[in-house]
Curated annotation (Swiss-Prot):
Taxonomic source organism: Mycobacterium sp. (strain KMS)
Role played: Part of the ABC transporter complex PotABCD involved in spermidine/putrescine import. Responsible for energy coupling to the transport system.
Membrane topology: Peripheral membrane protein
Subcellular localization, as worded in the UniProt entry: Cell membrane
Catalytic activity: ATP + H2O + polyamine-[polyamine-binding protein]Side 1 = ADP + phosphate + polyamineSide 2 + [polyamine-binding protein]Side 1
Record domain ABC transporter: where: 17-247
Name of protein: Spermidine/putrescine import ATP-binding protein PotA
Assembly, per entry: The complex is composed of two ATP-binding proteins (PotA), two transmembrane proteins (PotB and PotC) and a solute-binding protein (PotD).
Length: 388
């Protein structure tokens, strides 16, 4: 399926895309700072972050719409940093699909191979194959205006895939769809990517999209790549406070790491108690400032003191909010730190009122000690997402 780039045969043994210490400046503004990672063949790779983090600039450099200030971008082993977009074997799908309104679905998809002077039988084979993959065979004769938003999205995908690119670049393509359709299209995109086996590079600020579809995620912030990993790695073992806060919801409490208990656990002085916790990947010296992270759904709340190998603190109930499958408990620790717990509605939660004293506990394996950092407030996060 892979073709040549600027007349040079691709190296199929290495990664499809290599971002080699790439920096992009616009005057004095650093949009991307020393990005260094690779993307494997057949991988669904997402770049995730708030507005201004550098994800779209990185995608535009891969596509050829921007040129790196320094570093190199390689496509199947060939340096394409200064190769124009039309000579790179990649295609891009944007939020606005730019389908030809006067052409049928079939002719829209056929536009690419026809422009490459493929013979009629090859054009038919490719178009029919892609329409079957995106499940639009029965809509081949319709015009784009006769399709739903999700169907138009799939036409745009088929048109971008029909020339067999080495990688498909997707710049927030689901942003124009309503919430329910956007959720459905997440699973459709992943299904299509698995069927065609082509590398997808996906840009989004939506953490749910990235977690649902991706094989790996690069979380970006202020031009820097904060962490690259699988969705499970990113969620369960975030490398920084920013990643922990941006991916899902997290309790983040400032404290001091007092020492190492054994190979697997450390002790951290936080929430007015000394608690057993998992160390993160960044070493922190004894006595050093640190941040303890625990996800709200990993907390348990009870009126009775917990037993067994658990971390536990006393807390005071501030508020309870019913949110369908969970009850959101807002609590405060003895040192006035806020605690948020998500308790499944199927659990036998005691009847609680604001002001009640409870025990909040969790397994040490559910916690993670991260390097100390400023902890964003709820207002900071809402502003960040609004700007995205």
């Amino acid at each position: 399926m892979n073709q040549t780039v600027d007349g040079v045969a691709p190296n199929k043994s290495g990664p499809v895309i290599e971002i080699d210490h790439v920096t992009k400046r616009f005057a004095d503004y650093v949009a991307v700072a020393d990005a260094d990672f690779s993307i494997a063949s057949g991988e669904f790779f997402s770049m995730l972050g708030p507005s201004g983090c550098g994800k779209t600039t990185t995608l535009r450099m891969i596509a050829g719409f921007e040129t790196p200030t320094s570093g190199a971008i390689r496509l199947e082993g060939t340096d394409v940093s200064r190769v124009p977009p039309h000579k790179r074997n990649v295609n891009t799908v944007f939020q606005h699909y730019a389908l030809f309104p006067h052409m049928s679905v079939w002719d829209n998809v056929a536009y690419g191979p026809r422009s490459m002077k493929k013979d009629k039988s090859e054009v038919k084979r490719r178009v029919d194959e892609l329409l079957e993959v995106v499940r639009l065979t029965d809509f081949a004769k319709r015009k784009p205006g006769q399709l739903s938003g999700g169907q138009q999205q799939r036409v745009a995908l088929a048109r971008a895939l029909v020339n067999y690119p080495s990688a498909l670049l997707l710049d927030e393509p689901l942003g124009a769809l309503d919430l329910k359709l956007r959720h459905a299209m997440q699973f459709e995109l992943k299904r299509i990517q698995r069927e065609v086996g082509i590398t997808f590079i996906y840009v989004t600020h939506d953490q749910e999209e990235a977690l649902t579809m991706s094989d790996r995620i690069a979380v970006m912030n202020a031009g820097n790549v904060e962490q690259i990993g699988t969705p499970t790695d990113i969620y369960d073992r975030p490398a920084t406070v920013f990643v922990a806060n941006f991916i899902g919801q997290a309790n983040l409490w400032s404290g001091r790491q007092t020492g190492r208990l054994n190979r697997d656990y450390v002790e951290i002085d936080v929430l007015g108690s000394k608690l057993k916790a998992r160390p993160g990947d960044t070493a922190i010296e004894a006595g050093g400032h640190a941040t303890l992270m625990v996800r709200p759904e990993r907390l348990r709340v009870s009126m009775e003191p917990p037993v067994g190998d658990v971390a536990a603190v006393r807390a005071t109930v501030r508020d309870m909010t019913f949110q369908g499958p969970v009850v959101r408990l807002s609590l405060v620790a003895p040192d006035d730190s806020p605690i948020v717990a998500h308790v499944g509605t199927e659990q036998q939660l005691p009847l609680l009122r604001p002001g009640d004293e409870v025990y909040v506990c969790w397994s040490p394996d559910a916690s993670l000690v991260l390097p100390a950092a400023d902890i964003p407030t709820t207002e900071d996060l809402e502003e960040m997402l609004d700007e995205s």
